[in-house]
């Protein structure tokens, strides 16, 4: 019994901490953007963004499998989201030259950060509390679903498209093929997951 309570406490701490970290990402962007502009923005925020996306996704997958098992966990929208974030991190990390990556100076990078931080702060905050039955569709839910998420999806697609168009020395022929396949499958998979969100 004590072990179950500890597990639930740790789960709540994870959701709370992750929610605040994504809020901190937005605050960081709000501070940096007026000071340095899009040209120097990656130097002050990209490392934080990449680490946050990667580790929060890994932890969420662990919790997902812990509570729902492999069968239901791997077929969930949450797992698809986390897999997508991990893939995106692997594509745009630019670990050794992110200050100079042209892709990260594009407007889609800022819109991605804003929509990501808002949607994930809200998502993890909602998971702090158990809800039974049909969830109430509040104004915040509607804004997140019909405004924030579409901007996030379009911004990510733009970043992935730019990553193919703008060559860098991280690119390889195999990686280019994988990226093109992902782009082709992006909207069909996205629309399927989005439809499930609207009908749940």
Swiss-Prot record:
A biological-process GO annotation: chromosome organization
Keywords, ordered alphabetically: Cell wall biogenesis/degradation, Endoplasmic reticulum, Membrane, Transmembrane, Transmembrane helix
Cytoplasmic membrane side: 37-44, 104-145, 195-200
Bilayer-spanning residue ranges: 16-36, 45-65, 83-103, 146-166, 174-194
Subcellular location: Endoplasmic reticulum membrane
Job of this protein: Involved in the biosynthesis of (1->6)-beta-D-glucan polymers of the cell wall. Required for viability. Involved in maintaining chromosome stability.
Name this protein carries in UniProt: Beta-1,6-glucan synthesis-associated protein KEG1
